Regions:
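Short, well-ordered loop/turn sites that connect or cap secondary structure elements
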Residues: 36-38
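Short alpha-helix capping/helix-loop boundary micro-motifs
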Residues: 23-33
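Glycine- and charge-enriched low-complexity intrinsically disordered segments
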Residues: 2, 64-86
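Short, charged beta-turn/beta-strand-edge "cap" motif at the junction between a beta-strand
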Residues: 42, 46-52
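Short beta-strand-centered aromatic/proline hotspots
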Residues: 50-61
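Cystatin/cathelin-like cysteine-protease inhibitor module
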Residues: 5-8, 30, 61
Length: 86
């Protein structure tokens, strides 16, 4: 299943390894796609080189939205482009 693709900064993780969804590129993608974040929502998170599926959660500690990801499931974007061509 394809999930909405939202920019995320893979260097902007909290202490639990969740990606913070508060960068300008993230906010722009959410706005452009009219997405309102909700607990349990599934997203495809990407940057210039990487992509991974994640589950949205609200961080009470930081008062912002985060995405729980499996760091072992991160895919290289280049690999995905090559597979699409083949």
């Amino acid at each position: 299943m394809k999930y909405p693709r939202i920019f995320a900064d893979f260097h902007n993780a909290d202490e639990q390894g969740r990606l913070r969804l508060n960068r300008v590129g993230t906010i722009e993608d959410l706005s452009r796609q009219n997405i309102k974040l909700e607990d349990g929502q599934l997203l495809a998170l990407y940057d210039e080189e990487l992509e991974v599926d994640g589950v949205v959660q609200y961080s009470q500690e930081e008062s912002l939205w985060v995405a729980v990801i499996d760091w072992k499931q991160i895919r290289q974007v280049e690999d995905m482009l090559v597979q699409a061509i083949v």
